[in-house]
């Protein structure tokens, strides 16, 4: 539009140990860039459109992360718009939807881990006020003792036969709208089928979600044997206020199968609309698929 300008803010890469060559940034650095652009637009009395082609499977999946809340704050202001890509995780097999039946003692969640995986994380979120506990079983059948859910509790267990270390941390309601968060970290996992045994501690609906890292962050094959393609929209596109954009194939008017799907964890309708995402010409006249840096 007349009088508009493009402002670029380059973010430094994250220092977290993820796949070599992955495009990744620390959340606090992204927030610093957003604050800079927001304040610059205010100083110049200009409208501002923020476009984020980044996504993650970490966090609350409902707009409760610090970045999501900042984007919602900016999006609510006059002369501001925030647009976020929905990610490409629908067919990545890195989301699991659990649904425990009444009186069911536990449910086994199977994760297939390939060769030469240095480590990975998994995040379990319940539907409030559900509370669950987890135990881990290795491919050789060695089991970690059940760790009951307690606010702030954290345990680490070493599987001797595999040489794998698993740490489990519980958080009840912290930054997740009173949801329980169980964070699991696997270090040097051996190849095979790892099992998370999920035990209900109180039964309400007994629905829960587990997410593995986005494809771009994982080196090797890690996926759920019984995955679920729904609720795969990445954060911060899962936040309520920002405009989240999914992808479709413009050549045949079909849904791009990898495009992140809703709803978010709070059953809010996401994404807001779809845009062409297959064989799209970029500025350097090359073809791309997807609609974020995580392809």
Region annotations inferred by a language model:
Residues 1-295:
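Loop-rich non-cytosolic ectodomains and luminal regions
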């Amino acid at each position: 539009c007349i009088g508009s300008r493009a402002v670029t803010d380059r973010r430094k890469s994250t220092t977290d140990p993820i796949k070599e060559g992955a495009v990744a940034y620390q959340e606090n650095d992204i927030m610093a860039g957003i604050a800079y652009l927001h304040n610059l637009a205010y100083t110049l009395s200009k409208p501002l459109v923020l476009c984020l082609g980044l996504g993650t499977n970490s966090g609350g999946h409902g707009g409760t992360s610090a970045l999501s809340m900042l984007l919602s704050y900016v999006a609510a202001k006059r002369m501001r718009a925030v647009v976020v890509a929905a990610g490409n995780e629908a067919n990545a097999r890195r989301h699991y939807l659990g649904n425990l039946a009444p009186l069911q003692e536990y449910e086994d969640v199977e994760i297939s881990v390939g060769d030469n995986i240095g480590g990975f994380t998994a995040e379990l979120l319940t539907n409030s006020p559900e509370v669950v506990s987890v135990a881990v079983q290795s491919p050789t059948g060695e089991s970690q003792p059940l760790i009951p859910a307690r606010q702030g509790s954290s345990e680490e267990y070493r599987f001797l036969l595999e040489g794998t270390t698993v740490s489990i941390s519980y958080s009840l309601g912290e930054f997740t709208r009173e949801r329980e968060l169980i964070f699991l970290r696997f270090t040097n996992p051996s190849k095979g089928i790892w099992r998370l045994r999920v035990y209900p501690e109180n039964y309400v609906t007994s629905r829960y979600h587990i997410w593995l890292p986005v494809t771009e962050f994982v080196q090797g094959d890690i996926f759920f044997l019984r995955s679920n393609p729904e609720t795969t929209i990445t954060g911060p596109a899962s936040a309520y206020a920002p405009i989240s954009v999914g992808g479709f194939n413009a050549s045949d008017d079909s849904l791009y199968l990898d495009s992140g799907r809703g709803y978010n964890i709070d059953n809010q309708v996401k994404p807001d609309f779809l845009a062409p995402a297959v064989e799209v010409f970029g500025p350097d006249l090359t073809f791309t698929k997807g609609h974020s840096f995580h392809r």
